[in-house]
Amino acid sequence: SILIFDEAHLMPQDYLQPCLQAVAYITRYLHSEAVFLTATMPDFEKLIKEYALPDSKIVKLIKDTSMFAEFQKCRYRYIGGISSSELLSRCREYPSSLIIVNKKATARELYQECGGKRYHLSTYMTSYDRKRILKEIRQELKQLEADYPEYKDVPEDRRITIISTSLIEAGVDLDVYTVFRERTGLDSILQAGGRCNREGKRKTADVFIFDRTEETRQAVSDDKASLTKGLLKKYEDISDVRCIEEYYSRLYFMKVDDIQKNTMHQICSDLASIPFKEYAEKFEFIDSRQVSLVVPRDAQSEKLVETMKYTKTGNARKLQNYTCSVTRKELEDLIRQHAADDYGTGIYCLTNKDYYDEYKGVLFEAPDYFL
């Protein structure tokens, strides 16, 4: 068999060693091959030799990287601290802009502040609404390009601003004129760059990396963001292979204790001694602090929820399209306001439509009504 790992850099650091060891075992003892794909490749050769099977055979499929620069579609520029109003004003200078921020609350605040033609995307919105908005964005971008092929003299009322969380960075096919990315890990910033001049129709385009002046120092001092800041000062081009390699080398060095605490030790060569149950219980790709919340949006979803209420069983798969994500505290607030219930099934649903907006997502206070 051939196993393809897309976005391989997203393997969780806490369980990196068991992941790599599992891949190494599969390739050796089950006579398979593994292909790692990513635009931001860590030094997996070094990591596999250190944390998995040292004598594993590793081959780089692309040995000559000298032509990479020819395919570079954007340049990355760090602009430092900027206020929300300055950021939005600067975005409106371009035919189409994408702002990507680290927090859902920030995305919503910017959307509410933003004027003109604007779009908002976050997991506060259901998958149903995110797909609908993305379809509308693609249509608008396509029409904008048709009307202004050179993007010259685009009137203000036709300029597009998209405000999103990191959900737009992978698997979303959008091509905008300019991207503004709040400082975070280098891997995320380079993924954000993939939405800028995606089709390479212009010689170059800009991805601006910024810090929000409204954020506290603590909010932007996580390890990945701090590493990125140092690399932005050191490298003129942060998409350079050397920069990416240094980023991961330093990141994994900083996280060595996290990696080693869940190591599948070499003494576990006997399958019976591998703690499968412990790994299964602790291994998480999805943040456990987030909870799914079903928001009925049409007759089909309402019928599914009604069935769930009376049968006390829920079909999570069928409801997936109508599901958004909130924190446990946010869910508790909704329950306290009698706006959410699980009807004894463990699948929580929004019970009051006033607590949801199709463009903003879940609201945590119902709108005020005046008679």
Predicted regions, residues:
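Short glycine-/polar-rich loops that comprise or flank the Walker A/P-loop
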Residues: 1, 30-32, 69-74, 116-117, ...
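Conserved catalytic network of the ASCE P-loop NTPase/AAA+ motor domain
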Residues: 1, 25-31, 92, 142-156, ...
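Conserved helicase ATPase motor motifs in RecA-like P-loop NTPase domains
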Residues: 2, 7-47
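Hydrophobic residues in beta-strands of the RecA-like P-loop NTPase core, especially within AAA+ ATPase
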Residues: 4-5, 101, 164
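Interdomain hinge/linker at the junction between the two RecA-like core domains of SF2 helicases
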Residues: 25, 40-93
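C-terminal helicase lobe and adjacent C-terminal extensions/tails of nucleic-acid helicase motors
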Residues: 27, 85-94, 105, 109-112, ...
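Conserved two-lobed SF2 helicase motor
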Residues: 150-169, 181
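SF2 helicase motor core recognition
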Residues: 160-176, 191-199
